[in-house]
Amino acid sequence: MILKKFLLLAVSGTAMLPAYSKGYISYDESFKSNGMDIRFSSNQCNAFLEKLYECKNTFIKILPIKQTLKLHTAWINLDYAVYNGKLDDKYADDKYSIVFSDVNGDGVNDLIIQTGKKGAYGGPSYNIYLYRKGKFIYNRPLSQLTIGTNSLFRVNGNILTVGKTSGCCEYNKFTYKLHNDAVKLVRKETEVCESSSEKC
């Protein structure tokens, strides 16, 4: 079933959301977040969960810089579409579809978009775009850090940390240093934990 397009306007975290519907939809959504005007549009979205959609042939238009990103696949969570803030310990894992945050410690927000579910246990994976010379530029090494990991990495300056579970009881914490848009592993910590632990 094809549904007609709708418009979602989100301002300062407040949104009027469309009701859940089964089948495919054409999704055309506009919102504002701390001065960033964004438009998300796709002609083929399919409900993965009640309020989580997988969208093919997606266009994300960033109006202030007049840039449009074309993605084969992007995911949109109707309740948690966009986050603008730090990727620290207070960040809520696995919720937000679009994230504006300073990833490389240069004081300027970069862009993170959920494009898959290649994280640990089918969790989200992302495309990372660093802001350079007035545009968001895709960064493959950073994007690869979101595959197979327990959550999106945490950022402290140019230091990134991310966790990955191996089997039932081994938890690995990786620390990377970001320099010239490339990542270098500087530390790996491993601990054995109980299967009931949040880490495992």
What are these regions (language model features)?
Residues 118-122, 167-168:
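Short glycine/serine/proline-enriched coil/turn segments at secondary-structure junctions
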Residues 30, 97-105, 153-154:
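Structural signature of eukaryotic scaffold interfaces centered on beta-propeller domains
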Residues 62-66, 121-141, 174-180:
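Beta-propeller blade repeat segments, especially FG-GAP/WD-type strand-to-loop junctions
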Residues 3-14:
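Sec-dependent N-terminal signal peptides
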Residues 104-115, 158-161:
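Acidic/hydrophobic-patterned starts of short beta strands in beta-sheet-rich repeat architectures
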Residues 18-66, 150-200:
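Acidic, small-residue rich beta-repeat scaffolds with periodic aromatic anchors
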Residues 72-75, 138-143, 185-191:
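Beta-propeller fold detector
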Residues 77-96, 144-152, 196-197:
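Repeat-based blade/solenoid architectures
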